[in-house]
C-alpha cells in the first residue's frame, strides 16, 4: 500500500525511491510484523485467558504435557494479523503472487479457526470433523491450483524444478494442478502435525520462509535465474515481502511460544502457515525443494502414516507415540532437547536445500 504513496512522493523528493526496492521493503516488512507481534502479543494472551480459550491436552499423551492444559491457544491469529498488516503496508498490492498467498493464509486460517473454536469454545474435543476439514482444505487448494494454471503467462510458471539436475525441468501441463493441490494441502497438514511442542513448528517455518525469500528474490531476477538454471518468474520478487513478514511474525510469536509456552498457535496458525509455505513453493516452482527444506515436517507426517499403517496391518506400533516428537519424549528426552535438536535438523536441511541451487 505504502509503495504507491512513496511512488507519488518521489516526484517531490527522490529519497522516497528507496521504497521501490524489494529488499528495503522486505526488511521493513520483517520489522513491522515482528514489532506488531511483540506489542500485541501480551494483550492477546490476556484476552485469551479472560475468555478461557485454553489448550485441551490429550489424556493419553506424555505426562509432562498435563501442565500445559489451559494454556491459551489460537495464537495463530497473532501471527496472521502480523503478516497481513505487514504485507498490506509494504507489499505491491498489484501483484497476484501477493494475493495468492494472502488468500491461502486467510482460507486455511479460517478452517483452522473453526476447528479451534469448536474445540476450545464449544468444548467439542473432536473439533471440526476430519472429513469436512479435508473437504474445505481441498476446495481452497483446488481454487488456487486452477487459478495459477489458468493465469500462467510464462513457460517457467508450470515447469518442475528438480534439485541437483539443471537440465531437467519438465513441463507439468495439467498435472501442475494435481501437484499444486497436494503440495498445499500436504504442507498444511504436515506443519499441523509438527505443532505439538513449544516452538517446534514455528522455528522450522521461519527457516523455510527465510530460504524461500532468497529463492523468490533470485527467481524474480533474470540474471540470477539464468545463472542458477531456475525458472525466471517476473514479479516473483514481491514474494520476498510475504516471506519476510512470515519470518518476522513467526519470531514475534516465538517470543511467547518458546518453552514453557505462554500461548499456542492452534490450528488457525499451523494450517495457515503450512499452506502458505506450500503455496510459495508452488509459486516459485520448488515443490521438491520444500520436501527437502521442510524435512522435519515430512518426518513428522511419515511417522504418523507408518504408525497408523503398522497398527492397522500388524496390530503393532513402530513408535511409542506419533508424531515422532512424542516418541522421543516418552524415551525420556526433555521437551527442550527434542525441540532444539529438531531445530538443528531443520537448519541443516534448509542449508542443504539452498545448496542445491548451485549443486546442479
Curated annotation (Swiss-Prot):
Places the protein is found: Cell inner membrane
An annotated Gene Ontology molecular function: metal ion binding
Annotated pathway: Cell wall biogenesis; peptidoglycan biosynthesis
Keyword list, A-Z: Cell cycle, Cell division, Cell inner membrane, Cell membrane, Cell shape, Cell wall biogenesis/degradation, Magnesium, Membrane, Metal-binding, Peptidoglycan synthesis, Transferase, Transmembrane, Transmembrane helix
Membrane-topology annotation of the record: Multi-pass membrane protein
Cofactors (names): Mg(2+)
InterPro entries per UniProt: Glycosyl_transferase_4 (IPR000715), PNAcMuramoyl-5peptid_Trfase (IPR003524), PNAcMuramoyl-5peptid_Trfase_CS (IPR018480)
Membrane-spanning parts: 21-41, 74-94, 97-117, 135-155, 168-188, 199-219, 236-256, 263-283, 288-308, 338-358
Chief location bin: membrane
Residues annotated as signal peptide: none
Pfam families membership: Glycos_transf_4, MraY_sig1
Cell division as UniProt keyword: yes
Enzyme class: transferase
A cellular component term, taken from the record's GO annotations: plasma membrane
Catalysed reactions, semicolon-separated: UDP-N-acetyl-alpha-D-muramoyl-L-alanyl-gamma-D-glutamyl-meso-2,6-diaminopimeloyl-D-alanyl-D-alanine + di-trans,octa-cis-undecaprenyl phosphate = di-trans,octa-cis-undecaprenyl diphospho-N-acetyl-alpha-D-muramoyl-L-alanyl-D-glutamyl-meso-2,6-diaminopimeloyl-D-alanyl-D-alanine + UMP
EC number: 2.7.8.13
PROSITE patterns for this protein: MRAY_1, MRAY_2
Functional note: Catalyzes the initial step of the lipid cycle reactions in the biosynthesis of the cell wall peptidoglycan: transfers peptidoglycan precursor phospho-MurNAc-pentapeptide from UDP-MurNAc-pentapeptide onto the lipid carrier undecaprenyl phosphate, yielding undecaprenyl-pyrophosphoryl-MurNAc-pentapeptide, known as lipid I.
Family, per entry: Belongs to the glycosyltransferase 4 family. MraY subfamily.
Protein name as catalogued: Phospho-N-acetylmuramoyl-pentapeptide-transferase
